[in-house]
């Protein structure tokens, strides 16, 4: 993760007033967690920020309040200064928003952890790591924004789900370093981990009765 790229993205975030954040179709915990963490940080800093995804939030991921803020269409009457895509390796993964993103006249930022990312934005921060939620906290801090408990929980969701509860081979020392910082900011790793990996549906539980 280069300091120059972080500084450039921080400059873009701080110099704009209205930001659109997009994630990939059929969203997972990392896509939603990273996007909503950034949106929440921007809102806390007095910006207007919107999170958009072609598909609705899956029921199993509706464990954090911010999930209610995800839009499946562009907000009417809003003129964006900056567009940011998260956890999206190529433009087609933005689904119905791909054409809007491609034609946007202002700056676009692409933040992702997939090695296959094709650098489709004007500014691309692509780091090979376990999750985009391993990158987003660094972006937020570089912009001088605070990581609150709400933000930490959202980033924790992405770290947990994309790392398989820290069981995948791409988990590194830095993954745990970021996790420790999020825990220090109040992230409920035990609670989120339970919801994602241990809680059983009623129907599944009945199989053992």
Residue ranges and their predicted role:
Residues 111-178:
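Short alpha-helices
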Residues 22, 26, 85, 110-111, ...:
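Generic enzyme active-site microenvironment
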Residues 41, 100, 139, 157, ...:
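Hydrophobic/aromatic ligand-binding patch that stacks against planar heteroaromatic rings
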Residues 2-25, 33-62, 72, 76-80, ...:
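Hydrophobic helix-and-loop "lid/oligomerization" segment in the mid-to-C-terminal part
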Residues 41, 99-107, 142, 173-174:
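A glycine- and small-aliphatic-rich helix-loop capping segment at beta-alpha/alpha-beta transitions
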Residues 3-8, 89-90, 140-142:
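Short, motif-level signal for alpha-helix interfacial/capping segments enriched in acidic residues
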Residues 65-67, 72-122:
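Active-site cofactor/cluster-binding pocket
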Residues 29-35, 91-95:
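Short glycine/serine/threonine-rich phosphate/pyrophosphate-binding segments
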């Amino acid at each position: 993760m280069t300091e120059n790229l972080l500084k450039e993205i921080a400059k873009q975030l701080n110099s704009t007033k209205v930001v659109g954040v997009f994630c990939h179709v059929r969203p997972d915990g990392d896509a939603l967690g990273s996007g909503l963490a950034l949106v929440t940080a921007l809102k806390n800093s007095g910006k207007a920020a919107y999170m958009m995804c072609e598909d609705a939030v899956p029921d199993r991921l509706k464990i954090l309040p911010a999930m209610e803020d995800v839009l499946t269409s562009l907000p009417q009457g809003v003129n964006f200064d900056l567009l940011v895509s998260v956890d999206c390796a190529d433009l087609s993964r933005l689904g119905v928003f791909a054409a809007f993103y491609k034609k946007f006249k202002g700056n676009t930022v692409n933040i992702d952890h997939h090695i296959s990312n094709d650098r489709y934005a004007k500014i691309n921060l692509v780091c090979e790591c376990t999750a985009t939620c391993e990158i987003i906290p660094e972006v937020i801090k570089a912009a001088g924004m605070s990581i609150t408990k709400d933000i930490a929980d959202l980033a924790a969701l992405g770290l947990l789900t994309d790392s398989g509860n820290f069981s995948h081979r791409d988990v590194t020392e830095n993954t745990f370093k970021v996790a420790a910082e999020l825990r220090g900011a109040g992230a409920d790793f035990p609670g989120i981990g339970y919801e994602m990996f241990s809680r059983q549906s009623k129907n599944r539980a009945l199989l053992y009765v």
